[in-house]
């Protein structure tokens, strides 16, 4: 008997797969049509629930992946190090290869997966940037694991937001929803990603409403979609990871009202620092662009170099490597003196800029929160020495500082307040947090500062237009050159 042709197996398999997916989608639509009167609104809500579940699963897998790859890297370092070869020397090639591979995957397959990815989502909601979820999801997931696992000073919230938003677009494409509903599901996915990353559903909801206010299409249904996705993502994340507060710190009682003016001054300081920090991020990105000129081998070489640096730092001085989330409880707990806090603050600014400005697939939320905690604790210790009657515990300023720098850089004070409260479970710190975040935002706005993600999106669009013009010119010159040669 003749063998059954292999290509027919492939045809049969594809037909079965397409039939199964079509059957699921059609049955889901019949369910909506049968049990709901406002069919489009009901479909959007149920899809947002599904997106929230997927975003929670994705974020949980990403979180476990970071833990696993970090432990695997450390195990390799311990296995190949001994009395003659110190651990930091072994860490250099391992982390270098990890970061180099992350940079290669990003540049080769999905350049939009570089950085935090939040500006890409904002651009997509305005119709200015494409969402190529088939490429971005695997590249952001595995590239982010490699970059964060190598020891670079990056956060996982950016990848979680972009992954969640791309899941939203994937579901939109599968169910063929219209453009307006597609934007709502994109926003719902972003909210779910942030909510799951920080175990903060209210912050995830408010981030979309506050930070993406110019792109978000406000309606009752779209707002409900964002709520449902954020809540479901948080529930799924908690079920998988069994996690309550992301950061375990002291639970403070509310400070005295007469000390609130100190938190306002802290906010004013963060307003100035936030503007300078945003300018330094853009300047660092320009520096890297000048070095690699968008050439792949140069871009990957930068990744190899940074991986080597952060591989060594992760062993020698881990406090200035990694995301900084693990550093927050130690700083708030009073384990550092003022001199050490100042040095850590300055060095972490440098490592954050080197990591995030390079275009590596990772976020800046967590490093910003760590920087805010460092400066807040430094300010609190100084205030405690100057006003011992007003300041009983400097740690309250560390908690307020977490939200202060975030509010100044992102220009989202309400999100900053909710994010810190949900991350630390310090609900009685709400008033000092509000004063600090509003003070930071007021100063940043008064001095002409702009939200960092808005500036990053504008920069991305300018670079994209410049590359298109260069490509058009190159094609035109290539058509003209043969003609001139013939003449």
Residue spans for each PLM region:
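Alpha-helical transmembrane segments and immediately membrane-proximal extracytoplasmic
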Residues: 3-487
């Amino acid at each position: 008997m003749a063998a059954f042709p292999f290509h027919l197996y492939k045809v049969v398999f594809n037909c079965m797969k397409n039939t199964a997916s079509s059957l699921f989608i059609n049955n889901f639509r019949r369910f909506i049509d049968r049990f709901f009167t406002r069919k489009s609104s009901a479909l959007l809500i149920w899809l947002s629930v599904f997106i929230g579940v997927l975003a929670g699963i994705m974020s949980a897998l990403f979180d476990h992946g970071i833990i696993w790859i970090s432990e695997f890297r450390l195990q390799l370092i311990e296995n190949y190090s001994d009395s003659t070869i110190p651990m930091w020397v072994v860490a250099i090639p391992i982390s270098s290869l990890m970061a180099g591979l992350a940079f290669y995957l990003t540049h080769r397959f999905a350049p939009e997966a570089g950085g935090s990815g939040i500006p890409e989502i904002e651009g997509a909601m305005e119709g200015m940037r494409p969402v190529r979820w088939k490429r971005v999801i695997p590249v952001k997931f595995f590239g982010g694991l490699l970059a964060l696992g190598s020891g670079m000073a990056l956060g996982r919230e950016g990848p979680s937001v972009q992954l969640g938003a791309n899941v939203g677009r994937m579901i939109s494409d599968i169910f063929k929803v219209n453009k307006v509903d597609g934007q709502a599901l994109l926003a719902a996915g972003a909210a779910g990603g942030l909510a799951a990353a920080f175990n903060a559903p209210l912050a995830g909801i408010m981030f979309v409403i506050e930070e993406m206010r110019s792109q978000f299409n406000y309606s009752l249904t779209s707002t409900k979609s964002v709520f449902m996705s954020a809540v479901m993502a948080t529930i799924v994340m908690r079920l998988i990871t069994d996690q309550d507060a992301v950061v375990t710190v002291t639970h403070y009682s509310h400070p005295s009202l007469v000390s609130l003016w100190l938190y306002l001054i802290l906010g004013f300081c963060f307003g100035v620092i936030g503007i300078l920090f945003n300018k330094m991020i853009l300047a660092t990105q320009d520096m890297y662009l000048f070095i690699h000129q968008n050439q792949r081998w140069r871009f990957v070489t930068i990744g190899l170099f940074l991986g080597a640096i952060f591989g060594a730092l992760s062993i020698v001085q881990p406090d200035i490597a990694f995301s900084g989330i693990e550093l927050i409880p130690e700083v708030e707990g009073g384990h550092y003196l003022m001199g050490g806090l100042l040095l850590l603050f300055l060095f972490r600014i440098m490592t954050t800029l080197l990591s995030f400005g390079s275009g590596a697939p990772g976020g800046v939320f967590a490093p910003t929160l760590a920087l805010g905690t460092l400066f807040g604790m430094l300010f609190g210790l100084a205030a405690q020495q100057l006003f011992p009657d007003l300041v009983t515990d400097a740690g309250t300023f560390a908690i307020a500082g977490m939200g202060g720098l975030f509010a100044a850089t992102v220009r989202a004070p309400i999100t900053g307040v909710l994010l810190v409260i949900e991350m630390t479970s310090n609900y009685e710190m709400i008033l000092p947090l509000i004063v600090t975040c509003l003070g930071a935002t007021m100063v940043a706005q008064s001095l002409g500062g702009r939200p960092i993600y808005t500036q990053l999106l504008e920069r991305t669009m300018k670079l994209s237009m410049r590359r298109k013009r260069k490509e058009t010119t190159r094609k035109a010159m290539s058509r003209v050159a043969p003609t001139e040669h013939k003449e």
